[in-house]
């Protein structure tokens, strides 16, 4: 094979060599598609959890697991495995093979989509690398994302396996949050890379006091979004959303009774239903106020430029929608459709925040 057609370091662009405009558009479009697929996976994960489908497949076969049961005998084998765990005996006893197939397909689709995403990342990566469209640094980064995607699959199984315990009918909240958090972290990394490939040079924004203050506020708001998503994971993992289905008070109280009943105190943030739900409500409110502060500061600062101000406006609208979705999900006692949309829109809100930060990266840069 010729040197040009190999995956050698010399066959890729030097990191100091800019990627051609045509290649930048193709590469970034591909990565944006991966991001869209990841949002779909986050939605599928939420639906799988909310329908109680996550424990329906009791073996982990990364390669052959892509093939679903093709015979009645195989369906019976899978169902027999599921009947051995407490979730079936306590929650689904007697729902039959047809009921099992319904939850099986939800979990199978979630795993199948993960495999599709792996191929959608790896195959174009090989092509772009072979044709010399990628820099060495970008090849290394994208290969790392591929490996982390595989690790995320292993973390998913680590989470699911916790639900097979004889004293459990669901996965452990900490493992659920780990799986969710890693998905969002990988999503942020790929999104930032896609944005940077599409627009490698940041537009200069003068570093005035107002501009710097706005950028700091956006950073704070973005961090709060991440923390609130994490708190939402614990709300989901502890099923806290099925309690205190009133708003703005929690059964007539601002701070629910029993908030600090566990010892040591910090355990309440992760295991105590009243505390977990209150914290998620509080963080959501603080996040909305922080984004409001970003809007107030940013729209009064014309030096930011129209792209950044437009992104701030989108953040404002997105957080209002997300807050309304959260209240709706709570008051309706977490129907699967509402919970899925709420989790998915959290990814949309985070996306807009990352785009806003990316548009602000040129502050003070010439």
Curated annotation (Swiss-Prot):
Q: Which InterPro entries match?
A: COX15/CtaA_fam, HemeA_Synthase_type2
Q: List the GO terms this entry assigns under cellular component, sorted alphabetically.
A: plasma membrane
A single Pfam family, by name? COX15-CtaA
- The record lists the membrane-crossing segments as 27-47, 119-139, 142-162, 177-197, 217-237, 282-302, 314-334, 337-357
Which cysteine residues pair off into disulfide bonds? none
**What is the purpose of this protein?**
Catalyzes the conversion of heme O to heme A by two successive hydroxylations of the methyl group at C8. The first hydroxylation forms heme I, the second hydroxylation results in an unstable dihydroxymethyl group, which spontaneously dehydrates, resulting in the formyl group of heme A.
Q: Which organism is it from?
A: Gluconacetobacter diazotrophicus (strain ATCC 49037 / DSM 5601 / CCUG 37298 / CIP 103539 / LMG 7603 / PAl5)
Q: What is this protein called?
A: Heme A synthase
Q: Which UniProt key words apply to this protein?
A: Cell membrane, Heme biosynthesis, Iron, Membrane, Metal-binding, Oxidoreductase, Transmembrane, Transmembrane helix
Q: Into which family does the record put it?
A: Belongs to the COX15/CtaA family. Type 2 subfamily.
Q: Which HAMAP family match?
A: HemeA_synth_type2 (MF_01665)
Keyword Heme set for record: no
PANTHER family xrefs: CYTOCHROME C OXIDASE ASSEMBLY PROTEIN COX15, CYTOCHROME C OXIDASE ASSEMBLY PROTEIN COX15 HOMOLOG
Cofactor annotation: heme b
| Positions annotated to bind heme | 280, 342
MF terms in GO: metal ion binding; oxidoreductase activity, acting on NAD(P)H, heme protein as acceptor
Biological process terms from the Gene Ontology for this record are: heme A biosynthetic process
Q: What is its EC number?
A: 1.17.99.9
Q: In which pathway does it act?
A: Porphyrin-containing compound metabolism; heme A biosynthesis; heme A from heme O: step 1/1
Subunit info here reads:
Interacts with CtaB.
Provide the reaction this enzyme catalyses. Fe(II)-heme o + 2 A + H2O = Fe(II)-heme a + 2 AH2
């Amino acid at each position: 094979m010729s040197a040009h057609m190999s995956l050698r370091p010399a066959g890729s662009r030097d990191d100091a060599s800019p990627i051609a405009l045509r290649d930048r558009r193709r590469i970034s479009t591909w990565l944006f598609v991966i991001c869209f697929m990841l949002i779909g996976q986050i939605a599928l994960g939420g639906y799988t959890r909310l329908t109680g489908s996550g424990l329906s497949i009791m073996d982990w076969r990364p390669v052959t697991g892509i093939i679903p049961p093709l015979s009645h005998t195989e369906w019976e084998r899978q169902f027999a495995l599921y009947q051995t765990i407490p979730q079936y005996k306590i929650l689904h006893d007697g729902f039959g093979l047809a009921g099992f197939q319904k939850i099986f397909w939800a979990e199978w689709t979630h795993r199948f989509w993960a495999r599709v995403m792996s191929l959608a990342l790896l195959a174009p990566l090989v092509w772009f690398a072979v044709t010399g469209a990628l820099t060495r640094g970008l090849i290394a980064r994208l290969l790392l994302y591929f490996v982390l995607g595989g690790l995320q699959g292993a973390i998913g199984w680590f989470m699911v396996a916790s639900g097979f315990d004889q004293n459990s009918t669901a996965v452990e909240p900490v493992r659920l949050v780990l799986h969710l958090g890693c998905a969002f972290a990988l999503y942020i990394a790929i999104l930032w890379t896609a944005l940077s490939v599409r627009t490698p040079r940041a537009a200069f924004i003068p570093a005035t006091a107002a501009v710097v203050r706005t950028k700091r506020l956006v950073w704070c708001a973005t961090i709060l979004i991440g923390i609130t998503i994490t708190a939402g994971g614990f709300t989901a993992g502890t099923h806290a959303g099925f309690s205190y289905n009133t708003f703005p008070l929690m059964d007539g109280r601002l701070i629910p009774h029993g908030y600090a009943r566990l010892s040591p105190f910090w355990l309440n943030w992760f295991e105590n239903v009243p505390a977990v739900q209150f914290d998620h409500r509080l963080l959501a409110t603080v996040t909305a106020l922080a984004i409001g502060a970003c809007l107030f500061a940013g729209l009064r600062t014309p030096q930011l430029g129209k792209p950044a101000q437009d992104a701030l406006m989108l953040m404002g609208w997105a957080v209002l929608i997300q807050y309304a979705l959260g209240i709706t999900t709570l008051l309706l006692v977490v129907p699967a459709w509402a919970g899925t949309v709420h989790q998915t829109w959290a990814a949309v809100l985070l996306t807009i925040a990352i785009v806003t930060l990316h548009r602000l990266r040129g502050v003070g840069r010439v």
